[in-house]
Regions:
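Bacterial N-terminal signal peptides that target proteins for export
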Residues: 2-15
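N-terminal Sec signal peptide cleavage junction
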Residues: 24-25
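Short, low-complexity cationic-aromatic patches
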Residues: 32-46, 90-103
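Short N-proximal segments of mature Sec-exported proteins
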Residues: 44-52, 58, 66
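Acidic glycine-/aspartate-rich tracts in secreted/extracellular proteins
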Residues: 52-57, 110-114
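A low-complexity, Ser/Thr/Gly/Pro-enriched, surface-exposed linker/loop concept
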Residues: 60-87, 124-129
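Short, exposed beta-strand-loop hairpins at the edges of beta-sheets
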Residues: 107-121
Length: 131
């Protein structure tokens, strides 16, 4: 205990508690997707898809390069934290991507407005993502 400045101990405790509470808030993230009309949509309102060739729970995406140019991944920031049915996979380029129930999530470049689902069933391997 600091006998010269007793209020310093109280100030130190308050500062430590504040830092702990604020630090916890910084790591909280809202869900990376929303449900609209029974399908998952990204923060921009656009439909999200899963790729049948991605193995659920593998921790990676097999849609890279030209595939990812047509099916852009729903990217996660390095500071994002997964919770619930959401997880984060690491792409071949080292960047992070959101996944739902272990399946990486993607947009389709030919969807032009929220509510479009033109990629559903594409090549019989792309499906709208559902909760």
């Amino acid at each position: 205990m600091n006998f010269v400045f007793p209020s310093l101990n109280r100030l130190t405790a308050v500062a430590a508690l504040s830092a702990a509470l604020l630090g916890g808030c910084a790591s909280m993230a809202s869900a990376p997707a929303m449900v609209s009309n029974g399908v998952l949509t990204g923060p921009n309102g656009m439909t999200l898809y899963t790729f049948d060739k991605d193995a659920a729970g593998s921790g990676k995406s097999v849609c890279n390069g030209p595939c990812a140019a047509n099916w852009p991944p729903l990217m996660a920031a390095d500071t994002d934290k997964a919770s619930g049915d959401y997880s984060i996979v690491t792409r071949d380029d080292g960047k992070k991507q959101w996944a739902m129930k272990g399946k990486p999530l993607y947009y389709w470049v030919k969807d032009t407005k929220p509510g479009d689902m033109t990629g559903d069933g594409f090549n019989k391997v792309w499906q709208v993502a559902k909760p």
